[in-house]
A protein has these predicted regions:
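Receiver (REC) domain active-site loop signature in two-component systems and cognate sites
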Residues: 55
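Active-site residues of response regulator receiver
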Residues: 52, 82
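Short amphipathic alpha-helix used as the core "switch/output" element in two-component signaling
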Residues: 39, 61-74
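Conserved acidic carboxylate
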Residues: 8
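Helix N-cap/capping motif at the beta->alpha junctions
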Residues: 30-39, 60
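Charged docking surfaces used in two-component/phosphorelay signaling
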Residues: 15-23
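Active-site beta3 strand of CheY-like receiver
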Residues: 44-50
């Protein structure tokens, strides 16, 4: 079963995506901040990560930096799913092999699901 890690501090949003992906047959696990997200990815070894940028304790850019430092985290596809516009995105993301950058307000949950399917098909 394909595994998705959702690292998002907004419980309503993460739960909405969890239900959407589980209905599509994916295994989904969630973390509410970057620190917990790094731990989750280390244990879970997901096939893809949906990552918010602005979170408490550790933001998404720092979490992804930590994930990419690990052998197991170097090649996991990552979709940034955030309210931060691309022009405001942290510069360090440019060097962290982000597959796609999605502004939450720009896409419906169905469209995000399609983006994940496309990414997994590559």
């Amino acid at each position: 079963m394909t595994k998705i890690a959702i690292i998002e501090d907004d419980a309503v949003i993460s739960q909405m995506y969890r239900m959407k992906f589980e209905a599509e047959g994916y295994e989904v696990q969630m973390a509410a901040n970057g620190r917990l997200g790094v731990e989750l990815v280390g244990k879970m070894r997901p096939d893809i990560i949906l990552l918010d940028l602005r979170m408490p304790e550790m933001d998404g850019a720092e979490a992804l930096t930590q994930i990419r430092k690990k052998d197991w985290g170097k090649n996991i596809p990552v979709l940034i799913l955030t309210n931060v516009g691309v022009e405001e995105a942290p510069k360090e993301l440019e060097n962290l092999n982000v597959l796609s950058y999605i502004v939450k307000a720009d896409l419906t949950p169905r469209q995000v699901t399609e983006k994940v399917k496309e990414a997994l098909a590559k």
